[in-house]
């Protein structure tokens, strides 16, 4: 996943029409989550009809193999041959706003643990294994339906007006997992978690791609993926420790607070960037 993500995101940025980058990333996320929805649905049906876990995992290999066979058919736009560069971050110059954004992103990622904790939480609230699969299906469908509209809204109204609510939704959803206990409330939370995924995925990648130097777009998107990867590793270790020591609510209190704090910090960073651009234009 780490190898494919940055080149894929750079390819989307390169192929997108001007002014439609958020919608392009939204389209990618819609297709991604639609596939995830089908996977969750088939997993539910396999288990419901008595199939063991190992054969179910083996069946999942088929779409992966088909996808790999399709990739060579993709043709990139022809242009000037890229210059050979050393793989180093030392000479990479990033906008100060993007550096601060990455710092806040890593802070947020420390509270954004694996989705497996959401499923374990649902199971601890009385959902059966098959019902937990349906909850994941509901989350995936919600994210898939909202991904394109959220991306297009970020193209029209600006990235910050989608990103800030997205991070706030995350914080409130995680606090909801800590506070709410009924099955209906958890069902609503999984729908809202899908909305968070849709709001963030397109707008955030578009923001980073637009703020990156053209010749280093893939590299910067790789840094973005690296921060998310390390954040997921550390956050899952933290969440597991909190769960074992203080109970199943603790990781969600931690993640919820970090989500809301991150939303406020992102609002400050992006507003400061807008103010600086306005001052530059007046000069």
Give the positions of each predicted feature:
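Juxtamembrane intracellular "pre-TM" segments in multi-pass secondary transporters
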Residues: 76-104, 283
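Symmetry-related core transmembrane helices of the 12-TM Major Facilitator Superfamily/SLC fold
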Residues: 55-72, 252-268
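Helix-to-loop junctions at the C-terminal end of transmembrane segments
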Residues: 47, 146-158, 243-244
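Structural signature of the two symmetry-related core transmembrane helices
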Residues: 61, 161-176, 256
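Short amphipathic helix-loop junctions that connect adjacent transmembrane helices
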Residues: 116-132
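Helix-loop junctions on the cytosolic side of multi-pass membrane transporters
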Residues: 63, 71-85, 268-279
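Intracellular juxtamembrane helix-capping segments at the cytosolic ends
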Residues: 4-16, 199-212
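Cytoplasmic helix-loop-helix junction between adjacent transmembrane helices
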Residues: 1-32
